[in-house]
Regions:
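Short beta-strand segments
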Residues: 24-25, 61, 88-92, 133, ...
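Feature captures the catalytic cores and cofactor-binding loops of soluble hydro-lyases/lyases
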Residues: 31, 41-58, 68-69, 159-162, ...
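Conserved small/polar residues in nucleotide/adenosyl-binding loops
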Residues: 186-189
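Hydrophobic alpha-helical hairpins/lids featuring a short glycine-rich hinge
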Residues: 78-137
Length: 189
């Protein structure tokens, strides 16, 4: 199975071209795969693809500086989740969205949140986009999809943020490596 895993240089190259990729974590951790793309490349077609083919929760991975500048608070002040995933309150763009759930609305919310000029008044809570705060130090501190998405975007010369979505099988179970390989060959090549 190792031959199906791309070297990090290839992943960074894909990210620099605005391409989506699958990030797989260790078997002893979550043993799951996420669709990942630098957030600046997450248009409505990407969001729709993630919703349709990933089927998991679509999240916005942000560094701590952006979380702070947007005034986002953590969803829980006493995080007791297994991997201490740092979800913030959900968000929506203040302007330009309808109900907030469409692929277009979520893409607009993401673009608004990651803009270099964005401020806390540009977004509202609750919403249909779920930010996650990456730990400072990235994957060297926490080996999670959140930190990897931010690190890879940064290494690719992109805005240091990513959009991630867990990949589930048709029956609602989590996709594991054999299924993730099939998803990659079917949709991302």
């Amino acid at each position: 199975m190792k031959s199906y895993i791309s070297p990090i240089e290839d992943i960074i190259s894909e990210a620099s071209q605005g391409k989506m990729f699958i990030l797989v974590d260790a078997e002893e951790r979550e043993n799951e795969g996420d669709l990942v793309i630098p957030a600046e490349d997450a248009n409505d077609n990407v969001i729709n693809f993630m919703a349709k083919n990933g089927r998991g929760l679509i999240c916005l991975a942000l560094n701590d500086d952006k979380v702070d500048s947007l005034g986002l608070t953590l969803m829980s002040s006493n995080n007791q989740s297994r991997h201490e995933t740092a979800f913030t309150v959900s968000i929506e763009a203040r302007e330009g969205v309808t109900t907030g759930i469409s692929a277009q609305d979520r893409a607009l919310t993401i673009a608004t949140a990651i803009s270099d000029n964005s401020k806390s008044t540009d977004i509202v809570s609750p919403g249909h986009v779920f930010p996650i705060k990456a730990r400072p130090g990235g994957v060297l501190v926490r080996a999670g999809h959140t930190e990897a998405a931010v690190d890879i975007a940064k290494l690719a010369g992109k805005n240091p943020s990513g959009v991630i979505c867990e990949i589930m099988n048709d029956d609602g179970t989590m996709a594991r490596l054999p299924e993730l390989i099939a998803v990659s060959y079917t949709h991302l090549r």
